[in-house]
Amino acid sequence: MNRMWEKKFWISCFFIILFFILVTLQVMVELGRFEKRETKSFTVIDIKEQKKPLLKHIKEKSNSRLRHLKDNYPIMLWWSPLTGENGRLGQCGTDTCFFTINRTYLQDPMTKAILFYGTDFNMTSLPLPREISHEWALFHEESPKNNYKLFHEPAITLFNHTATFSRHSHLPLTSQYLEGLQALRSKEYLISIQKKNFLRKRLAPLAYVQSDCDPPSDRDSYVQELMKYIAVDSYGECLHNRDLPQQVNNPSSMDDSQFHHILAQYKFILAFENAVCEDYITEKLWRPLKLGAVPVYFGAPNVENWLPSNKSAIIVGRFSHPKELATYIKKLDKNDKLYMQFIEWKLHGNINNKHLLSTITERKWGVQDVTQDNYIDAFECMICKRVWENVRLKDRVSTTKLWNAESLHLNCPAPEAFSFLPGHLLKSSMREMWKPSFEQSKKEAKALRTLVDRNRNFTTVEFWNLVFKFQ
């Protein structure tokens, strides 16, 4: 009995001691955490306080150096923070200019040009009043849907210098998505007609890859109608009916080699732009040409001026209805001889379009080429050289040259929706929005011009009040 009691006593003591040990450990852990938080908080604050004088000194020294550097050179002020550069001396041949996104340079007497990026163009935050010596320059390589108001004469003619996708701009960017002629001639992804015919057992003749649905071109409505008459494998979010492998199923993989190998298996690829404007040509056209497929193209009405060969793409605009287009594609799909006429240029690397050849060989910038300037560098240097040209002219003859943008430098027609049989169209608020938005942008462009010509700052309320007056 005594032994039993003694055993129970020692067991109880063991659990009591264990309990106190656990409690003690927990307290120590919590104290440690508290001390760590206190130490960490003190260290961060202490380091920040120590760094403040040093950072201030470095910043003051850096700003002082930049101010000193720019004193002897014309200043090119990016009003849009596109480059992210606080200050840089840029060498453009024998000319040098100071490029910056720092708006405090606006009042500097050496500031000669204000550079804008079209997508970021904000009409209620402009460098007004505009000095006589300030030339405005517009860089806008993107679709009109990003900023429709710039595509009307009252707005585009506010600028002196332009770099847009239009061949008529001062620095045309029409070929911005084409690395070079070798990319077109390359046979890296080219698949034989025999293998493509074999692959047709599990693939549709046409591939469609779009995730920007219901854009101004209304391409999804056309493709939806086309799908009634011919099979289309649609990999993107728009009209999706086939999945890509997981490893390439994201936008960043569109330039991935594995994705290219998948598309290269198709005989035809639907190449539909998001907007219909002359010279607005994107990777939608160049990608199938590089892969050895036949692009079925809808977009720039003058695309034939840019094709490598007369018979290298099927132009959607030549067909009265998607059904007629489907019939033609089926004909080529069944007849290797007819199909191969569209691949002949690729097999022999025969690019006979003189306009395309001269554009690529003569352009002053490159695409994904570290040995060349990119098109932003070329844009900056174009303006820098023009500013210096006027500096030299003024020294010699007291007159300067005036550059002005024209309506053709950025010009697109109103977006039009396709109208097939009732009840067969895609219903989308976005689809219905584009034409009213375009018409509204005309009034916005007119209001913008009126207020800028007044040459003083204006508010958002003033802008919209004027827009509504033009209704």
From Swiss-Prot:
Main location: endoplasmic reticulum
InterPro entries on file: Alpha-1_3-FUT_met (IPR017176), Glyco_tran_10_C (IPR055270), Glyco_tran_10_N (IPR031481), Glyco_trans_10 (IPR001503), GT10-like_C_sf (IPR038577)
Gene3D superfamilies, sorted: Glycosyl transferase family 10, C-terminal domain
Name of this protein: GDP-fucose protein O-fucosyltransferase 3
Family indicated by similarity: Belongs to the glycosyltransferase 10 family.
Membrane topology: Single-pass type II membrane protein
GO terms under cellular component: endoplasmic reticulum; endoplasmic reticulum membrane; Golgi membrane
